[in-house]
Amino acid sequence: MRQDDAQLRHIFLHDVPLLDVRAPVEFAQGAFPGAVNHPLMDDAERHQVGLCYRQQGQPAAIALGQQLVSGHTRRERIAAWAAFAQAHPDGLLYCLRGGLRSQIALQWLHSEAGIAYPRVPGGYKALRMFLIDTTQAAAQECDFVLLSGLTGTGKTALIAQLAQGLDLEGHANHRGSSFGQRLDGQPSQVDFEHRLAIDILKKQARGHRAFVLEDEGRHVGRCSVPLALRQRLERAPIVCLQDSFGARVERIVGDYVIGQCADFVAAHGPALGFERFSTRLLDSLGKLARRLGGARYQQLHADMQAALARQQASGDIDLHRHWIAALVRDYYDPMYAFQRQSRPGRIVFEGDLPAVLAYLRAGCG
C-alpha cells in the first residue's frame, strides 16, 4: 500500500474531521461524511476568479482573489478556519487538488491566527479517487449475495441485522420504490458513492470479505449503484426472504403510513404535516399511473383519498390496508414474479426471517 493510500485509509477508518475550503457549489456536488465547508471563496467570487484565470492567466486571477477576499471578509473566513482547527486539532484541510486554495488558506491561518494545520495531499480529488478505487477493488475481490423477496418482507431491516450488510437504501436515504422518497431528500450521487465506499472500507477493516445487499437494481431513487458493483451484482447468488401477505401489508402500513405521517407531522406540525404527507402519498401513486393503467389507477387513487380522509378525521388507518393490499397483490407481486423468472438458477436459498438470517450469518462472514 502506498504511503498516501495509507493516510487516506486512516482518514476514513477513523472519521478524521475534514475542513473543506472549496466553494459551496462544489461542496454541494459532493463531499465526505462529517466534512464541514468553510470556503476560501464563495460561489460568485470563485466564478469571477475563474473567468479572470481563463482570460488573463494565473497571476491576475490570484491578485483578483486577494482583492475579493480581503478586509472583513478575509478576517471572517480565517476566524471560521481557526474555530474549526481549535475544535478539531486532529483534523485536516483540503481543497480540490491540494493546490493554491488550501495553500493560501493555510498561509493565512498560520500568519494571522498562529495555527499550523495539515492538509490532505491531493485534496478532494485524491480522497474521491481512493474511495472509487475501494469500491472497484471490492467488486473484483469480494463475494456478494443479493437479498431478494416480495415487497414488504422486511429486507432492509434484515440487512441492518447483518454485520456484513451493506444498506444501499440507507446510504441513498430512499426506500427504493415509487413510495420510497424520504422527508429530507437524497444525497448527491457523489455523496452516495462515498458513503457506500466508506461502509465497505470499514467492514473490510473488521475482517469481512463477503457482503449482503438488498436486490435494488440499478437505482435507489435517483442514486445509481456504482457501475463496477452493479456489474458484479448481476452475477451474484440470490437469497429470498419470505413472509405472509398479511404481515407484509402491516409492515408497509407501518413504514409508509404510520412512520411517514409521523415524520411529516414532526417536521411541519399536525395540519401542514398531514397535508404534505397526503400530497406525498398521492404523488407517489401518481408515478405508477401509466404502469397501472387508467381504471386501476383511478380506483387506487380513490381508495387512497378515502383512507387519508378517514385518517385525518379520526386517526383510523384501517382503510389504508385496502389500497396497499390491492397494490401489492395486483402490481408489486406480479412484477417480482416476472423478475424472478428472468434470473433462473441464481436463487440459492429461500426462507423466513430466522432461516435467512441463520443462512447468511453462516455463509457470508
UniProtKB/Swiss-Prot annotation:
The gene is selU. GO terms for molecular function: transferase activity, transferring alkyl or aryl (other than methyl) groups; tRNA 2-selenouridine synthase activity. SMART domains: RHOD. PANTHER family: TRNA 2-SELENOURIDINE SYNTHASE. InterPro entries: P-loop_NTPase (IPR027417), Rhodanese-like_dom (IPR001763), Rhodanese-like_dom_sf (IPR036873), SelU (IPR017582). The keyword Transferase applies. The active site is at C95. Keywords: Selenium, Transferase. Residues 12-136 form the Rhodanese domain. Its EC number is 2.9.1.3. One of its GO terms (biological process) is tRNA wobble uridine modification. SUPFAM superfamilies: P-loop containing nucleoside triphosphate hydrolases, Rhodanese/Cell cycle control phosphatase. It is an enzyme of class 2 (transferase). This is tRNA 2-selenouridine synthase. PROSITE patterns: RHODANESE_3. Monomer. Involved in the post-transcriptional modification of the uridine at the wobble position (U34) of tRNA(Lys), tRNA(Glu) and tRNA(Gln). Catalyzes the conversion of 2-thiouridine (S2U-RNA) to 2-selenouridine (Se2U-RNA). Acts in a two-step process involving geranylation of 2-thiouridine (S2U) to S-geranyl-2-thiouridine (geS2U) and subsequent selenation of the latter derivative to 2-selenouridine (Se2U) in the tRNA chain.
